[in-house]
């Protein structure tokens, strides 16, 4: 094999590695959630060891640079995360955007959970008159509500309640600081008259 051919193979290998890194970065960015290394290997049609090696190279390229992200690997699952030193800025963004980013259905569902917790999805659906699966999923993803047990009836449905993040987002010291529902209803009925 001549030297030119070896150099061409090396260039092709570097190009292929960079393509894989680009794809991995896109997948991690779009997912927002941890992705198993095995799943990345399947998507890329390569071995898990190669994916692990690429991830280490990628993370090394983020370390020490003025980059705002890094790769977190835990239990063979990978996630693109912000660097801890930027957390105060990320928190500010999340606090200002959480109310704007919740749909009407999510806000209704959150209100029901806040006032009736712990409560099942079926009970929420009955109060709203429509299914609440998507709204509950969104609220769980945003860590505003959590699963807080199971109701002791056949089927053992999940009970939902609010989180510390809920209190932070709405500037409340405790769940007891939520305005009294009856007082709110009286106030709204006065405004309508």
UniProtKB/Swiss-Prot annotation:
It is found in: Cytoplasm. GO terms for biological process: cell division; chromosome separation; DNA replication. The keyword Signal does not apply. Disulfide bonds: none annotated. GO terms for cellular component: cytoplasm. It holds the Pfam family SMC_ScpB. Belongs to the ScpB family. Participates in chromosomal partition during cell division. May act via the formation of a condensin-like complex containing Smc and ScpA that pull DNA away from mid-cell into both cell halves. PANTHER family: SEGREGATION AND CONDENSATION PROTEIN B. Homodimer. Homodimerization may be required to stabilize the binding of ScpA to the Smc head domains. Component of a cohesin-like complex composed of ScpA, ScpB and the Smc homodimer, in which ScpA and ScpB bind to the head domain of Smc. The presence of the three proteins is required for the association of the complex with DNA. This is Segregation and condensation protein B. It comes from Clostridium botulinum (strain Hall / ATCC 3502 / NCTC 13319 / Type A). The lineage of its organism: Bacteria, Bacillati, Bacillota, Clostridia, Eubacteriales.
